[in-house]
Curated annotation (Swiss-Prot):
Function as written in the Swiss-Prot or TrEMBL entry: O-methyltransferase that catalyzes the 2 O-methylation steps in the ubiquinone biosynthetic pathway.
UniProt xrefs under InterPro entries: SAM-dependent_MTases_sf, UbiG_MeTrfase
GO terms of biological process kind: methylation
Pathway of action: Cofactor biosynthesis; ubiquinone biosynthesis
EC class: transferase
Pfam family membership, one: Methyltransf_23
Native organism: Shewanella sp. (strain MR-7)
Catalytic activity: a 3-demethylubiquinol + S-adenosyl-L-methionine = a ubiquinol + S-adenosyl-L-homocysteine + H(+); a 3-(all-trans-polyprenyl)benzene-1,2-diol + S-adenosyl-L-methionine = a 2-methoxy-6-(all-trans-polyprenyl)phenol + S-adenosyl-L-homocysteine + H(+)
Lineage: superkingdom: Bacteria
Family as reported in the entry's similarity comment: Belongs to the methyltransferase superfamily. UbiG/COQ3 family.
Name of the protein in question: Ubiquinone biosynthesis O-methyltransferase
Amino acid sequence: MQQNTNVDPQEIAKFERMAETWWDLNGEFKPLHLLNPLRLNYIDQTAGGIFGKKVLDVGCGGGILSESMARIGAIVHGLDMGEEPLEVARLHALETGVSINYVKNTAEAHREDHREYYDVVTCMEMLEHVPDPLSVIQACCDMVKPGGFVFFSTINRNIKSFVETIIGAEYLLKMLPIGTHDHNKFIKPSELMALVDNTDLLCKDALGITYNPLTGIFKYTPKVDVNYMIATQKVD
């Protein structure tokens, strides 16, 4: 799939409906706010620092990760297909005085004018929401410079992830709206790495993230059985 065809309208509509709560620290996106410091630290440390680097945030939504990267000195472009989340992101950036270029586009279409343009590309919690993950991965690869880093995060597909992210997070703890995730669209680490192997990206690291509902704290874990991130680097 290419250009603007790799989009699930139902997924876009889902996040459009929740857009106004994106920056509510106790709202529907509270898990992303709690998780974000871990994501930011992992990206910054693994990429050797992102200060002054051109960074593309694919599937940026309301801009939680985009803003945090801009605040530590990255030159950030945010990409999403949801108009409402992008408007929220733009408004919040104005309110906080952060400079970010937000664009409504797919990764595949944005690639046409941005081949080997970025030092770092992030694609976090997005692959499980598109019909063709490989198409997005390939576009991310094409847009990063040789030697640059591309980061992906998603959710493993197994019984434990179903219990924790859907039964637990959506139905019991009410951390997310019911229907936020579709377990069938979750991606096993082996599947994600197999997709990466179809590109010029090399997997450099994989790291899990776990949540303790008693303390309300996310932390790193070597286990990738539920939420996980991978760091890849483009071959020179």
